[in-house]
Amino acid sequence: MDKQALFDQIKGGLIVSCQALEHEPLYTKGGGIMPLMAKAAAQSGAVGIRANTVRDITQIKEAVDLPVIGIIKKDYEGTPMYITVTMKEVDELVACGVDILAVQGTSALRPDGSTAAQFIEAIKAKYPEQLVMADCATIEEGIACANAGADFVGTTMRGYTPETQGCDDIDFDFIHELSEKCPAKIIAEGHIHYPEQAKK
Protein backbone atom coordinates (compact mmCIF):
# COMPACT_ATOMS: atom_id res chain seq x y z
CA MET A 1 0.00 0.00 0.00
CA ASP A 2 1.42 3.40 -0.95
CA LYS A 3 1.56 6.38 1.38
CA GLN A 4 -1.51 8.18 0.07
CA ALA A 5 -3.67 5.04 0.07
CA LEU A 6 -2.62 4.22 3.61
CA PHE A 7 -3.21 7.78 4.75
CA ASP A 8 -6.65 7.79 3.16
CA GLN A 9 -7.44 4.60 5.07
CA ILE A 10 -6.42 5.97 8.47
CA LYS A 11 -7.34 9.66 8.05
CA GLY A 12 -9.85 10.81 10.65
CA GLY A 13 -9.87 7.43 12.38
CA LEU A 14 -8.53 6.05 15.63
CA ILE A 15 -5.22 4.18 15.78
CA VAL A 16 -5.06 2.05 18.92
CA SER A 17 -1.83 1.30 20.75
CA CYS A 18 -1.62 -2.37 21.75
CA GLN A 19 1.55 -2.66 23.83
CA ALA A 20 2.69 -4.20 27.10
CA LEU A 21 6.21 -4.08 28.50
CA GLU A 22 7.68 -6.87 30.64
CA HIS A 23 6.81 -5.20 33.95
CA GLU A 24 3.17 -4.61 32.97
CA PRO A 25 0.21 -6.90 33.81
CA LEU A 26 -0.78 -7.72 30.21
CA TYR A 27 2.69 -8.91 29.24
CA THR A 28 3.24 -12.65 28.82
CA LYS A 29 6.40 -14.44 27.70
CA GLY A 30 4.54 -16.32 25.01
CA GLY A 31 2.54 -13.37 23.73
CA GLY A 32 -1.05 -13.82 22.62
CA ILE A 33 -2.58 -10.95 24.59
CA MET A 34 -1.81 -8.06 22.24
CA PRO A 35 -3.44 -9.69 19.19
CA LEU A 36 -6.61 -10.11 21.25
CA MET A 37 -6.49 -6.42 22.13
CA ALA A 38 -5.97 -5.63 18.46
CA LYS A 39 -8.98 -7.77 17.53
CA ALA A 40 -11.11 -5.90 20.06
CA ALA A 41 -9.88 -2.58 18.69
CA ALA A 42 -10.62 -3.65 15.12
CA GLN A 43 -14.12 -4.82 16.03
CA SER A 44 -14.72 -1.45 17.68
CA GLY A 45 -13.76 0.50 14.56
CA ALA A 46 -10.03 1.21 14.87
CA VAL A 47 -8.34 2.04 11.57
CA GLY A 48 -4.84 1.00 12.63
CA ILE A 49 -2.73 -0.52 15.40
CA ARG A 50 0.53 0.63 16.98
CA ALA A 51 2.60 -2.20 18.43
CA ASN A 52 5.97 -2.91 20.03
CA THR A 53 8.31 -5.88 19.38
CA VAL A 54 8.56 -8.20 16.41
CA ARG A 55 6.67 -10.94 18.27
CA ASP A 56 3.62 -8.80 19.01
CA ILE A 57 3.62 -7.17 15.57
CA THR A 58 3.76 -10.56 13.84
CA GLN A 59 0.93 -11.94 15.98
CA ILE A 60 -1.18 -8.82 15.46
CA LYS A 61 -0.74 -8.88 11.69
CA GLU A 62 -1.95 -12.48 11.71
CA ALA A 63 -5.00 -11.51 13.79
CA VAL A 64 -6.27 -8.33 12.10
CA ASP A 65 -6.27 -6.80 8.63
CA LEU A 66 -5.29 -3.29 9.67
CA PRO A 67 -2.19 -1.18 9.05
CA VAL A 68 0.37 -1.61 11.81
CA ILE A 69 2.73 1.07 13.07
CA GLY A 70 5.67 -0.88 14.44
CA ILE A 71 8.29 0.08 17.00
CA ILE A 72 10.92 -1.60 19.14
CA LYS A 73 11.47 -0.02 22.54
CA LYS A 74 14.91 -0.54 24.01
CA ASP A 75 17.01 1.47 26.45
CA TYR A 76 20.53 2.42 25.41
CA GLU A 77 23.30 3.74 27.64
CA GLY A 78 24.18 7.38 27.14
CA THR A 79 21.02 8.48 25.35
CA PRO A 80 17.38 9.10 26.29
CA MET A 81 16.35 7.65 22.93
CA TYR A 82 14.41 4.39 23.24
CA ILE A 83 11.98 4.06 20.31
CA THR A 84 13.56 2.20 17.35
CA VAL A 85 17.00 3.66 18.00
CA THR A 86 19.35 1.67 15.74
CA MET A 87 19.38 0.14 12.27
CA LYS A 88 19.27 -3.31 13.89
CA GLU A 89 15.72 -2.60 15.09
CA VAL A 90 14.83 -1.11 11.72
CA ASP A 91 15.99 -4.27 9.93
CA GLU A 92 13.88 -6.41 12.26
CA LEU A 93 10.77 -4.27 11.77
CA VAL A 94 11.11 -4.21 7.99
CA ALA A 95 11.57 -7.98 7.96
CA CYS A 96 8.32 -8.54 9.84
CA GLY A 97 6.39 -6.36 7.41
CA VAL A 98 5.34 -3.28 9.36
CA ASP A 99 3.22 -0.90 7.31
CA ILE A 100 4.70 2.15 9.04
CA LEU A 101 8.02 2.02 10.86
CA ALA A 102 8.14 4.53 13.73
CA VAL A 103 11.35 5.99 15.15
CA GLN A 104 12.02 8.53 17.86
CA GLY A 105 12.42 11.91 16.20
CA THR A 106 13.41 14.06 19.16
CA SER A 107 16.51 16.24 19.39
CA ALA A 108 18.72 13.92 21.47
CA LEU A 109 21.47 12.03 19.68
CA ARG A 110 21.50 8.30 19.10
CA PRO A 111 24.26 6.06 20.55
CA ASP A 112 26.32 6.49 17.38
CA GLY A 113 26.02 10.29 17.59
CA SER A 114 23.57 10.66 14.72
CA THR A 115 20.54 12.94 14.75
CA ALA A 116 17.00 11.79 14.09
CA ALA A 117 17.13 13.37 10.64
CA GLN A 118 20.36 11.56 9.77
CA PHE A 119 18.88 8.27 10.98
CA ILE A 120 15.76 8.74 8.86
CA GLU A 121 17.89 9.54 5.82
CA ALA A 122 19.83 6.31 6.40
CA ILE A 123 16.60 4.31 6.69
CA LYS A 124 15.24 5.78 3.47
CA ALA A 125 18.52 5.08 1.68
CA LYS A 126 18.42 1.44 2.75
CA TYR A 127 14.65 0.92 2.46
CA PRO A 128 13.31 3.57 0.05
CA GLU A 129 9.82 2.06 -0.11
CA GLN A 130 9.35 1.74 3.66
CA LEU A 131 6.95 4.26 5.20
CA VAL A 132 8.53 5.98 8.19
CA MET A 133 6.94 7.86 11.09
CA ALA A 134 8.91 10.19 13.36
CA ASP A 135 7.76 10.48 16.99
CA CYS A 136 8.42 14.13 17.79
CA ALA A 137 7.89 16.67 20.58
CA THR A 138 8.35 20.05 18.87
CA ILE A 139 7.56 21.81 15.60
CA GLU A 140 11.26 22.05 14.75
CA GLU A 141 11.78 18.31 15.25
CA GLY A 142 8.79 17.50 13.06
CA ILE A 143 9.96 19.72 10.23
CA ALA A 144 13.52 18.37 10.39
CA CYS A 145 12.33 14.76 10.31
CA ALA A 146 9.90 15.43 7.46
CA ASN A 147 12.61 17.14 5.43
CA ALA A 148 14.81 14.09 6.05
CA GLY A 149 12.18 11.83 4.51
CA ALA A 150 9.69 10.90 7.24
CA ASP A 151 6.32 10.21 5.66
CA PHE A 152 4.42 10.76 8.90
CA VAL A 153 5.15 12.86 11.98
CA GLY A 154 3.53 12.00 15.29
CA THR A 155 3.10 14.19 18.37
CA THR A 156 4.03 11.14 20.45
CA MET A 157 6.87 12.62 22.47
CA ARG A 158 5.38 16.00 23.43
CA GLY A 159 5.60 16.28 27.20
CA TYR A 160 8.21 13.54 27.46
CA THR A 161 11.36 15.50 26.62
CA PRO A 162 13.24 18.14 28.64
CA GLU A 163 12.16 20.82 26.17
CA THR A 164 8.47 19.98 26.55
CA GLN A 165 8.18 19.14 30.24
CA GLY A 166 4.86 20.33 31.62
CA CYS A 167 2.96 19.67 28.39
CA ASP A 168 0.82 17.08 30.12
CA ASP A 169 -2.41 17.52 28.18
CA ILE A 170 -3.29 17.32 24.51
CA ASP A 171 -2.30 20.56 22.77
CA PHE A 172 -4.60 21.20 19.82
CA ASP A 173 -2.83 24.46 18.94
CA PHE A 174 0.45 22.55 18.67
CA ILE A 175 -1.13 19.89 16.46
CA HIS A 176 -2.67 22.56 14.22
CA GLU A 177 0.60 24.48 13.91
CA LEU A 178 2.51 21.29 13.16
CA SER A 179 0.04 20.36 10.43
CA GLU A 180 0.40 23.85 8.93
CA LYS A 181 4.20 23.95 8.93
CA CYS A 182 5.29 20.33 8.51
CA PRO A 183 5.32 18.81 5.00
CA ALA A 184 4.66 15.26 6.30
CA LYS A 185 1.29 13.78 7.22
CA ILE A 186 0.50 14.34 10.90
CA ILE A 187 -0.66 11.68 13.37
CA ALA A 188 -1.90 13.10 16.69
CA GLU A 189 -0.67 10.83 19.47
CA GLY A 190 -0.25 11.15 23.21
CA HIS A 191 -2.39 12.62 26.00
CA ILE A 192 -5.59 11.55 24.24
CA HIS A 193 -7.67 10.09 27.06
CA TYR A 194 -11.31 10.69 26.10
CA PRO A 195 -13.48 10.16 22.99
CA GLU A 196 -14.21 13.88 22.82
CA GLN A 197 -10.50 14.63 22.50
CA ALA A 198 -10.07 12.06 19.74
CA LYS A 199 -13.04 13.44 17.81
CA LYS A 200 -11.66 16.97 17.96
Where in this protein do the model-derived segments appear?
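Catalytic cores of alpha/beta
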Residues: 29, 78-96, 137-151, 184, ...
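N-terminal amphipathic alpha-helix/helix-capping segment at the start of soluble metabolic enzymes
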Residues: 1-28, 61
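Short beta-strand/loop segments at the ligand-binding rim of alpha/beta enzyme cores
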Residues: 11-16, 64-78, 124-137, 179-190
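Glycine/Thr-rich beta-alpha phosphate-binding loop at enzyme active sites
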Residues: 100-112, 146-174
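Charged helix-capping and loop-helix junction motifs
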Residues: 30-35, 82-88, 115-120, 167-176
